[in-house]
Amino acid sequence: MKKKLIIGTRSSPLALWQADFTQAELSKHFPDLEIELKLVKTTGDVLLDSPLSKIGDMGLFTKDIEKHLISGEIDLAVHSLKDVPTETPEGLMLSAFTEREDTRDVIISKNGESLKTLKQDAKIATSSLRRTSQLLSMRPDFQMGDIRGNLNTRFKKFDESDFDAMMLAYAGVHRLNFGDRISEILPHEVMLPAVGQGALGIETRVDDEATKEIVSVMNNVNTEFCTKAERALLRHLQGGCQIPIGSYASLKNGNLHLLAYVGSVDGKRTIRNEITKENCTLPEQAEQAGIELAEELLKQGANEILAEIRKTC
C-alpha cells in the first residue's frame, strides 16, 4: 500500500471542489494515506479570449495535467469527465468513474425567465456548440454569444453584461452553491447533455497497480457503463474539434438506454435517436451500444452535418 498520493488538478474553484471531494472520499477508505494536491495551469485556463469552438477542445483542460502524470510527478488526475478526450494518451487510463451528479443543463436568466418565456431575440451566453445547436433548433430567434472563464468568472461577466440568460451544467452550479441562480432545469427531452457530464474521471498510469487499486473504491459501475456508452458513441463520430453532439445513457435493471443528438450549429438540421441494450452486464456491451447508435446516426445523415462543421475547425 502506498503511503502518499499526489493528485493533479486545475486551480479553478470547480476543479478544486472535485479534487477536494476525491481526497475526502479516499481518506474515508484510507485514513492513514497522505494525500497532497498539485495545482496545474492548463491551456484551457490560459486561452480565454477565444471561443472553444474556434480553438477546439481536445484535451485543452487535460493535456497539461497528463504530462505531470506521465512523468510521475503526480499519481492521479481528477477531471470533469466531459473534458476528457475519448482517446487517452499512451500509458494512461481512466481507472474510476465517480457517482454521477444530475446531468441536466440549466438556464440562468436575469429575471427568472424560462426557455419559453425569454423575450424574442433574447441574447444567450454559452461557450458550447452543443447547447447552441439545440437551443436554436427550438428558438431560432435567440442571439447566441460567448462567455469564457471559470464558473465564478462567468457569473460575474454575465451579471455585468447585456446577456438575458446563460446556460450552464447543473452539476457545476450545484457543487459551487449557485443553485439559487437557476431559472430552469432543462429535461433531456429538451436538451441532451455533453458526453460524461456530471461525472468525474480519475486518470492513472496503466502500470501503477497500487494507485489503481486505491482509486477503485470510488468507481461507480452505473456511471462507468453509462459514460463508456456515451464516450464510445462520441469516439465513433468525432473528428477532432468541438462539435454539437449530446448524449445521455441510463442503466436500469440491467438494461442500458442511450439517447443521442447531432445537429448543425444553427440548429436547422438535427438528428435524435436512441437505442436500448438489454442484459448489459459488461462495459464492452455498453460501448458496443454507443457504436451501434453512432452508426445509426451516420446513416441518418450525421456524417454530412459533421463534415460541414469540421471544415471550420
Curated annotation (Swiss-Prot):
Record bears the keyword DNA repair: no
Entry's EC annotation: 2.5.1.61
GO CC entries: cytoplasm
Cofactors: dipyrromethane
Subunit structure: Monomer.
Further remark: The porphobilinogen subunits are added to the dipyrromethane group.
NCBIfam families: hemC
Protein name in UniProt: Porphobilinogen deaminase
Underlying gene: hemC
